Amino acid sequence: MLKQKLFKFKPNKFIANYFFFCLFFFTFFASGMVDSQDGFQYLAITRRMYYDHTFELPVKKPPHNVHMNIFPGKDGKIYSPTGLGYSLAFLPAVMFEDLFLKLSGREPLATFPLESDWPVLLVASMTNAFFGAILVVTLYQYLKSFNINHKRSLLLSFIAMVSTNLFVYTKHVYPHMMFVSFLTLAFYLLRQYSLKKQKKHLFFSGLAYGVVIITYNPTFVLPALPFALYYLLLTKVKFNLKKIKSNIKILKQIIIDAFYGFLGILPFWLIYSCFNTVRFGNATSAGYGSSAGTKLPLIPPPYVIIEGIWGVLFSPGRSIFIYTPLLLMLFLFWWKLKKRLIPEIISFSLLSLIYVLMIGINRGAEDFLAWHGEVSWGNRYMIVIIPFLFILIANIYQTLSKYNKYFAFLPLVLIGLYVQSLGILFPYQIKRGALPNDIYINEDSLNFGEYPNFIPRYSAVFKMSKVLFKRLKNIKNIYDHGDYNLKLYDGYDSPFDLGWTKWRGTMPTAHISFDNNKKDKIHDLTLQFRNHQLIPSSTYSAQISFNLNDQNLDQSTIIIPADKDQEAKLQFSTDILKDQNNILKVDTNYIGTSSAQLKKKQTIFLQIIRINGLAQNINTLDYPYVSPISESLYGTEYHYWGNEEQNLWEIWNVHSRVFEETFDLWWLRPLHYWDFPKDVFSVLFTLNIIGIVFFGNKIWIHILFKAKTE
């Protein structure tokens, strides 16, 4: 009895523990970078609101800014057609950035997002973990409302996230996770009203739908009809033509209920209207469709409809069943759905039908079909229907035999986990890597955003699976600095893969660091280079000179003719070597020209580094991020990137190399960017692990105790 009192199950406390466990769990997989143009655009607006108190987009224009979707406002200034809600969600990220800016005495970056520092990107990349956690606990509560027991609701709500296409959107910086989490909450609160008959649930349902309205774009109208129908089906409204008084009473009740819901929606509708009026002079205009160009017909051509709907459902590259295999349970066991689920079956089916039709026929331009969700992992536009269809799947699961669970449900869960792990571990952008820009079928041109969706060998899951196995095979080369802790930490391009070996492109000034191993001290250091011709007409010889620990090694200077390889055996006294952090500076110039680089003509490759006759690994990725905050707070000094080379696009390209060629996890970033503050990241990583373990343990205790008492 005493034990039961001490461990009394408290639903609200459990929900809080479950929320924080999911928050820390999803945060663990965050990127540490903003990985979408949409995300940068929303974040740019947040920074403008916070620092400059305006909705106007940054005035900096290309080439010093990343391209954004812009539209002229009523005042002639440029604005984004994006929603306000997701920009407000980035306020913690900008406040975190502002804290570091004040500590470092720096002004906010003017050319954001091209020049963006790590604090704001780190926290921004974790934003959707918060909304993912909201969605999980909402699904848990939703499932319990169908009398699915605590343990099973817990298991299924978590599976609903990690084995479906929802998982990657707790990571990728798009507004869809915020949209779907509050939409699911709005539907759940309608169900709560039908069960408890408390008007407050209608009001809070309206509040949740109000958040949906301001989150993203005008697609908030798509769920409106299923939302209203769900209310009518849940409340079992039945009009009788012969009973006028009864009909009036029912209609009066509907109006009263609608009023409570409208009270919740109203403040957000006013915010939405004011936001649009300030920008575009019209309360209902969000900027979409106001740009110049050919006006698209209301009804698209038949090929658009057929191709889009088929693509959403069955294409090898973007089928919703490939990215969320669990949806197949609805086709395998639809006959197990109970009659009591009629409100959910009808409303959720209508919602799915609307999205399949509307997304399937969606066109961004006359020759651009956008049904596939554009640049994303899976179809981001279609994730809205996943939580609702999963509620039906969870009810089916209740009726399954052990055989069906092990041989149907479980395999689909595992396949889904694998597919989502590809989108979690790697940036989704690299699925297009090494693909030709266009292919031609007769007179039709298909770009790399189209044909991989229809040809299986180029599909994202197939292509990224090959990347996974290759990356795992090569993982030692990415992180192993060897016995001498060798790092090509500045002025070297990413490894150029020739198949049998990899070379490193060398900038005009490059730096290598290494330690002097106590067991096998360095007495011989040799570097081999190639002066590679990119075009035959460029025939400049290259001179390479060396400086070790601030001492010039004049006798080691070499001159390499065009299209030749040559070794440089460094001549130095072992007395100048330190036990740790020896710095070798490599200077390159071309004889007969004042150009430090001959882009698209010639390049210098480092082929091999040998220490004491043994080849060393030169494939680790060690770069400066070029962080003004780190420079001020930690006294970081930059040599090539951030000093000699300050072109923002060149530095952006450095970030892109690390982003594309490493595992996409925030806590791995300091292993590649040596100017990231390792103490800050270590503390955050430790807190992340502690959060997962602490709240995971709380949940485990709840499960054990609940299992004994049920």
Predicted regions and their residues:
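Membrane-proximal envelope and lipid/glycan-remodeling enzymes
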Residues: L2-G499, I544, Y625-E710
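Basic, ligand-binding patches in group-transfer machinery
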Residues: I475-D679
